[in-house]
C-alpha cells in the first residue's frame, strides 16, 4: 500500500499510493502557506484599516465565497486555471525534450484552488478573533507611542492569535 509503484492492471497488480499521499500533504501544506497570510492580512485590513462602508461591502462578499461548494471551486479551476497553466507550461518547457505536458492539471493548479478555497474561512475566523481583542489594549499601545501599524502587528494580531489558529 505504501509502495511507490502504481500498476493496477499489471499481471501482478501493485497499488502503491505513497506518492499520492505525499503529494496531498505537500499540496495542502503549500496552500496553507499561501492562503493563511493572505487571509490574515485581509482580515486585518477589514477590521483595522478600511472604512465601515468598504467593510460592509467586502464582508458579505467573503461570506458568500464561504458558501460556494468545493466542487464549484474545482470546476472553475478546471475550466479557467488549467488552460492558463497549460499555456504557461508550454511556454516554460518549449525546448524541453523530456517534459511530459499535463494540460495544466498539476499540483500548482490544486494548490491555487485550495488556497482560494480556504480564504473565506480563515478571513471570517480572523475577523472574529481580531474584533474580540479589547479596545483598551489598542488604546494602551497607542498611548505608549506605538504607531497604528505597530499596534496592529505587535498587539492586536498576537492577542488574537489563539482564535486565528483555531480557525
Regions found by a protein language model. Give the residues of each.
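Membrane-helix/interface signature in polytopic inner-membrane proteins
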Residues: 126-139, 147
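Glycine/proline-centered hinge or cleavage motifs at structural transition points of membrane proteins
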Residues: 69, 144-145, 158
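Generic hydrophobic transmembrane alpha-helix motif, especially the helices
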Residues: 65-111
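Periplasmic/extracellular loop-to-transmembrane helix junction in inner-membrane transport proteins
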Residues: 1-30, 51, 100
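Transmembrane-helix boundary motif in ABC transporter permease subunits
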Residues: 31-62
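Residue-level signal for discrete positions within transmembrane alpha-helices
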Residues: 20, 24, 60-63, 67, ...
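Transmembrane helix-loop junction
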Residues: 43, 47-48, 79, 83, ...
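Transmembrane alpha-helices
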Residues: 64, 122-126, 148-167
Amino acid at each position: 500500500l505504501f509502495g511507490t509503484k502504481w500498476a493496477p492492471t499489471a499481471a501482478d497488480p501493485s497499488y502503491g499510493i505513497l506518492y499520492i499521499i505525499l503529494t496531498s500533504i505537500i499540496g495542502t501544506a503549500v496552500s496553507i502557506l499561501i492562503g493563511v497570510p493572505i487571509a490574515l492580512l485581509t482580515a486585518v485590513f477589514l477590521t483595522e484599516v478600511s472604512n465601515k462602508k468598504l467593510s460592509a461591502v467586502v464582508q458579505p462578499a467573503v461570506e458568500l465565497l464561504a458558501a460556494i461548494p468545493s466542487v464549484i471551486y474545482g470546476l472553475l479551476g478546471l475550466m479557467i486555471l488549467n488552460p492558463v497553466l497549460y499555456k504557461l507550461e508550454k511556454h516554460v518547457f518549449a525546448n524541453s525534450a523530456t517534459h511530459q505536458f499535463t494540460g495544466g492539471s498539476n499540483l500548482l493548479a490544486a494548490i491555487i484552488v485550495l488556497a482560494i478555497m480556504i480564504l473565506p474561512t480563515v478571513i471570517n475566523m480572523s475577523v472574529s478573533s481580531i474584533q474580540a481583542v479589547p479596545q483598551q489594549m489598542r488604546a494602551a499601545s497607542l498611548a505608549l507611542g506605538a504607531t497604528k501599524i505597530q499596534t496592529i502587528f505587535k498587539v492586536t494580531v498576537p492577542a488574537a492569535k489563539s482564535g486565528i489558529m483555531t480557525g
